[in-house]
Amino acid sequence: MKISKKATTIAVINQKGGTGKTTTCENLGVGLAMEGKKVLLVDADPQGSLTVSMGWQDPDALPTTLSTLMQKAMNDQCIPPGEGILHHAEGVDLIPANIELAGLEVALVNTMSREKVMKQVLDSAKREYDFILLDCTPSLGMLTVNALAAADTTLIPVQAQYLSAKGLEQLLQTVQKVRRQINPKLKIEGILLTMTDSRTNYGQQIDNLIRGAYGSKIKVFDQTIPRSVRAAEISAVGKSIFQHDPKGKVAEAYRSLTKTNY
């Protein structure tokens, strides 16, 4: 009997909203599935942005979400294989999220091994997939710490603007702290510049600034994700960029990111 390898778990993380985190999680996941990989996406954000973007427009109506599964883990209840997992037409699976996750984050504070509850939920799934991608909440609270404790690597999308670049320091300190105290194997996959505009001097300056400040310590992906109206539309259509605008520059960018780095 062939034993499948354990999935690589990637936390897509930035404590700042609007950096292209959900878009990256969705399109990297579908891109990997197009390469023949088995992919599980996990919406770890109470806003449920990834769930909505994948086509489940009313996350609050879903009977089982990440919150349900984490609550079961906290209560030492058995989680049957595949429970709560939704199947998307583009070949990826999803553990959805909704606002209940915000209440669960509060409950985590008084839980034993509170940083590792999400890891408990995902450990059984690691044998079934090649990649697990976590779309993290835009904060550095207990849910994000849980995601980092469950991850092998982190991917940091950064919008190509100065303030977004400034917030990187705090995020990197959190990653280092989790590595030191909870998950010594945690690596930083790299920084992905999103919503770039290479036609402007300002866009090029920010690109150079981030590469200059961090490039010697952390990989900054050569591939950047350009700003695009079509990419902004995908959360409303329930499809990835590969279905919505397959010949566009954003689809090409995510295709290149996937092929070159995974």
Model regions: which residues?
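P-loop NTP-binding core
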Residues: 1-262
